[in-house]
From Swiss-Prot:
Swiss-Prot/TrEMBL keywords: Exonuclease, Hydrolase, Nuclease
Pfam families according to UniProt: Rv2179c-like
One MF term in the entry's GO annotations: single-stranded DNA 3'-5' DNA exonuclease activity
Catalytic activity, reaction form: Exonucleolytic cleavage in the 3'- to 5'-direction to yield nucleoside 5'-phosphates
Record-annotated membrane-spanning stretches: none
Name recorded for this polypeptide: Exodeoxyribonuclease
Role according to the record: 3'-5' exonuclease that preferentially uses ssDNA as substrate. Plays a role in group I intron homing. May play a role in the final step of host DNA degradation, by scavenging DNA into mononucleotides.
Covalent S-S links between cysteines: none
EC code(s) of this entry: 3.1.11.1
Organism: Enterobacteria phage T4
InterPro entries documented for this protein: RNaseH-like_sf (IPR012337), Rv2179c-like (IPR033390)
């Protein structure tokens, strides 16, 4: 049985935000199984959404648009239209296909994201959109059977890392130098792989399976940022 992690990149901050892409990676939660950054990225998928078709239906907020203008060129290129762009309806269908193909048990698997008020509410609202398209009335919308894992198995990455490292507000975990070679911040699939590794290493440090690296041996890309 695998767990999974999701990350949306968006044009807003609420559950109705326009979605740029959705990344998902299924992973083995066993702390003795530590895969490389590249191995995790290669197992995952990134679903790129058509932004134009979301105008008038989902929210594009001015502050988020301005925020994207200040990100790296590598991150901003993910916003540009591409031949791989799909509708939100088709994108969620691709997401469901991936979940079903990777040994995810909706009753036992844990689903992870960085902040419980962001990714899962967006995912649930996109599932509701599918129900609306199928003619389900607003007072009958019910996503319980359609979510990839039950709500009580949805977990927050920040809380996990903070609890394992026993330091308030420490929501990133120092990783050995070279662990994140090739990482691009705000590339959703890279963010997912990074967070899997942070949770794994935080657990390994807590269990005494491995010592945390010294400051000199720490990967600088794993050190705290503004977010």
């Amino acid at each position: 049985m695998f767990d999974f992690i999701i990350d949306f990149e968006t044009m807003g901050s609420g559950e109705k935000a326009a979605v740029i892409d959705l990344a998902v990676i299924a992973f083995d939660p066993n702390p003795e199984v530590v895969e490389t950054f590249d191995e995790l990225v290669s197992r995952g998928i990134k679903i790129k959404f058509d932004l134009k078709s979301q105008k008038g239906h989902r929210l594009f907020t001015k502050s988020t648009i301005e925020w994207w203008k200040n990100q790296s060129p590598e991150a901003r290129k993910n916003i540009a239209p591409s031949d791989e762009d799909v509708s939100t309806i088709d994108g969620i269908a691709k997401f469901n296909d991936y979940i079903n193909a990777h040994n995810i048990d909706p009753w036992k698997s844990q689903g992870w994201c960085r902040g419980m008020s962001f990714d899962f509410p967006i995912l649930v609202d996109l599932i509701r959109d599918i129900q609306r398209l199928n003619g389900v009335s607003e007072n009958e919308l019910d996503t319980f059977k359609l979510e990839p894992c039950k709500f009580w198995n949805q977990r927050d990455i920040r809380t996990r890392i903070e609890a394992l490292l026993l330091v308030r507000d420490m929501t990133t975990c120092p990783l050995p130098k070279g662990t994140l070679d090739g990482f691009v911040a705000h590339d959703s699939i890279h963010d997912c792989a990074k967070d899997i590794l942070m949770m794994k290493y935080a657990l390994r440090y807590a269990m005494g399976l491995e010592d945390a690296p010294s400051e000199e041996e720490c990967d600088p890309l794993s050190l705290p940022t503004k977010r």
